[in-house]
Amino acid sequence: MYAMYVTFIVSTYWWLSREEGEDYGFRGIESYNKKVLQVFHVGIAGGEPLLRYDVVRLFCEEMPGHISVITNGTIPLQRIDGLYFYFVSLDGIKEAHNQIRGKGSYYTTRRNILDYIKRYSTDGYKAWKDIWLSLTINSINYRFIEDYIKEWYGIVNKVAVQFHTPFIDDDPLMLRFGYERDRVIDELLMLSKKYPNFIANKPKQLNLLRKSWGGKGRVPIACPSWAVLALDHMGRVKKPCCIGSHDNSAVKPICEECGLSIYSLLYSIGIKNTM
């Protein structure tokens, strides 16, 4: 039996699919897991999951070493026993990140990362290893990739990159397939050698993202979306993938232009939809 990566949305907000209602709760998800799945890893995302540190701690107690938290880093980071790592979304150098996420957001996230490393680097514990960065490359930040890598190399553990996945045609943030996108991927391959063991993406995955690979229109075809069970805060399965919605009438991502890291990683190592 293979393991699955599971994403639970524990935040109370997601702008495309938000509905009011009580959280499904950790115990409900735990029961579902034990009855239905053999889970290898749980990624807790949002929204902002650190609004619910209590839920994060419960998961870490239940599955120590198999929990990661995807956060925007605007809430101070706490060391949690059993947490594999924090995945902090930092979308470029200061100017680019602030343009995407709002004035002052870069300073807040950077401060919280550095404060965490300083606070918990005691008694031989290497707190920097707990921090991975997540960079979603788009039409705003793609020109500053090396500046970004240079700034964080030697401070945090790794950076994982992906490309913006559109929900609408002519999305202004989408970095289209073609010359500029190829140039960025060539640069990432070069930087992987210049800054060893820092960029988490392997060459095969990066090269995959040069063109359409997983779907047609808004339908996943070769994409192994089945390998990632994505649940929202009510415990409902999100379709077609972790950035979708349980609501079939909601706007769906354009699979044909997918740049998501987790699915392209699985595809690049041979896990594909063959049905």
Question: Model-predicted segments: where are they?
Answer:
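N-terminal [4Fe-4S]-dependent radical SAM core
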Residues: 10, 35-38, 225-228, 271-275
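A sequence-level detector of short linear motifs
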Residues: 77, 238-240
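Conserved alpha-helical substructure of the radical SAM core
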Residues: 1-79
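Local cysteine-cluster metal-coordination motifs and their immediate loop/turn environment
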Residues: 1-12, 225, 253-263
